[in-house]
Amino acid sequence: MIIEEIQGNIANLSQDEKQKHVEKVYLENSDLVKRIQRVKTDHGNEIGIRLKQPIDLQYGDILYQDDTNMIIVDVNSEDLLVIKPRNLKEMGDIAHQLGNRHLPAQFTETEMLIQYDYLVEDLLKELGIPYSHEDRKVNQAFRHIGHSHD
């Protein structure tokens, strides 16, 4: 089976639609940005992904579905630093430092998430900014944004 387009996301399904038999494809965060790949489901079925559109995969994307079954994307846990600034100054200070290092970050209402880096952990300790080191699933890929200093 070759998957060429995403058929939706389980977050947008009704409770009835979520009752289908679910097969999962577990991906590393770095694999979410790959348009072409061969993967194996948790039931041992091999499928090819060759997306026509240049989009990143996300947790819950539906790769295939019929009347009774669906295959969805799940994401393996990631080794993260979860940064919890107490105020705008701390948030600005650490965001500036991370930006200077060109580190991709993700944000929730109260947290900044970055892939684990011992140098950043040392910096957080030095600055006294609250953080935790966690194994956590993220819904989308960490992506570097290119730029130049011209």
Curated annotation (Swiss-Prot):
Signal peptide: none
Keywords from the UniProt entry: Chaperone, Cytoplasm, Nickel, Nickel insertion
Pfam families in the cross-refs: UreE_C, UreE_N
Cysteine disulfide links: none
InterPro entries: UreE (IPR012406), UreE_C_dom (IPR007864), UreE_N (IPR004029), UreE_N_sf (IPR036118)
Keyword Signal found: no
GO terms, biological process: protein folding; protein-containing complex assembly; urea metabolic process
GO cellular component terms given for this protein: cytoplasm
Compartments in which it is found: Cytoplasm
Gene Ontology molecular function: nickel cation binding; unfolded protein binding
SMART domains per UniProt: UreE_N
Source organism superkingdom: Bacteria
Primary subcellular site in the record, as a coarse category: cytoplasm
Main function: Involved in urease metallocenter assembly. Binds nickel. Probably functions as a nickel donor during metallocenter assembly.
Family assignment from sequence similarity: Belongs to the UreE family.
Protein's recorded name: Urease accessory protein UreE
Protein's organism: Staphylococcus epidermidis (strain ATCC 35984 / DSM 28319 / BCRC 17069 / CCUG 31568 / BM 3577 / RP62A)
Organismal lineage: Bacteria, Bacillati, Bacillota, Bacilli, Bacillales
